[in-house]
Swiss-Prot record:
It catalyses: N-acetyl-L-glutamate + ATP = N-acetyl-L-glutamyl 5-phosphate + ADP. Catalyzes the ATP-dependent phosphorylation of N-acetyl-L-glutamate. Keywords: Amino-acid biosynthesis, Arginine biosynthesis, ATP-binding, Cytoplasm, Kinase, Nucleotide-binding, Transferase. It comes from Cytophaga hutchinsonii (strain ATCC 33406 / DSM 1761 / CIP 103989 / NBRC 15051 / NCIMB 9469 / D465). Pathway: Amino-acid biosynthesis; L-arginine biosynthesis; N(2)-acetyl-L-ornithine from L-glutamate: step 2/4. The gene is argB. This is Acetylglutamate kinase.
Amino acid sequence: MQKLYIIKVGGNIIDNPEALTSFLKDFASLKENKILVHGGGKVATEISKGLGIEAQMVDGRRITDAETLKIVTMVYGGLINKNIVAKLQSNECNAIGLTGADANIMLSSKRPLKNGIDYGFVGDVKKVHPQPLIHLLSQGITPVVAPLTHDGNGTMLNTNADTVASELAVALCGAFAVNLVYCFELKGVLRDFEDKDSVISTINPDTYEELKSTGVINKGMIPKLDNSFNAINAGVSSVIICQAESLVELINENKTVGTKLVAN
């Protein structure tokens, strides 16, 4: 079975033009089948502020009202997605930009009230149709997927990019040996946020619960790890959380980097 790397990039990489350009050059050089999933929350937040709309976040997830939905659709599906595609094309990586609505790749349902919180137009993934992605990969085309899905009734939904990446990984397990990689600005999951070298090399479900209870893992890292363990339990070959600069070492040079998520 062929390998497939599903790589999610986020954090400060998207916001830093030099870091993003360097990362995309590395991504383009990867020899295996690959899909890129991107976030972009900080860009959307800046544009929201400029328009007088204050971003609201709960546990790393954005609350999306009707006006914010317009902004994230423009920013995620347009500005960020197409800039990434253009940069990949300049590195001889034939990429195509997509949302979950394109080719009906990813259907979601609007999240119901959760603990009294109305997340607005936020989608919880209910169905992934991997065949269009399999076809694109077979033609040597690299999908670049924005964190937007649709409800099947004409409404776009903002969807956590980590979730999009893990759901794609699970859906493509039947066709590929899928490896899920979360790339951001840190070297991995840190035991001490003040010590950027305090990388936790492996985390299993038991140590994850312990790290959450002691506050070592919190905020936006929680949905990332929740999605990671869901993917492992569903048959994804490996999940790595690492620094964007380590991507070539990990994939082309087969080196050990970052934090690896493992089953008990």
